[in-house]
Amino acid sequence: MASLLPQSERETLSNTLPHWQVEAGRLKRNWQFKDFSEAFAFMTRVALLAEAMQHHPNWSNVYNRVSIELTTHDLGGLSDLDVQLARSIDALC
């Protein structure tokens, strides 16, 4: 079961996940790809990760740009699942 991250861990996320922004109980990151096909391929890989974890992102896609927000709605903030999914997404890049 997921658990909310303690304040001490939330404060160090900028060091452990340097490409992600921490805002209002969410992790946020934006990507820009060569074209729509590359953006969609990335989203497909993320979807497979998220489905395997049963933890799904809030995201949007406009042509070659993808924005992802991670939060654990059931807990009302950032959890260890959000950090794990962010790390897995980073490993795809």
UniProtKB/Swiss-Prot annotation:
Top EC class of this enzyme: lyase
This enzyme's EC code(s): 4.2.1.96
Family matches, as InterPro entries: PCD_sf (IPR036428), Pterin_deHydtase (IPR001533)
Ranges in coiled-coil conformation: none
Gene Ontology biological process terms in this record: tetrahydrobiopterin biosynthetic process
CDD domains: PCD_DCoH_subfamily_b
Keywords in alphabetical order: Lyase
Extent of the signal sequence: none
Family under the similarity heading: Belongs to the pterin-4-alpha-carbinolamine dehydratase family.
The name this protein goes by in its record: Putative pterin-4-alpha-carbinolamine dehydratase
Source species: Synechococcus sp. (strain WH7803)
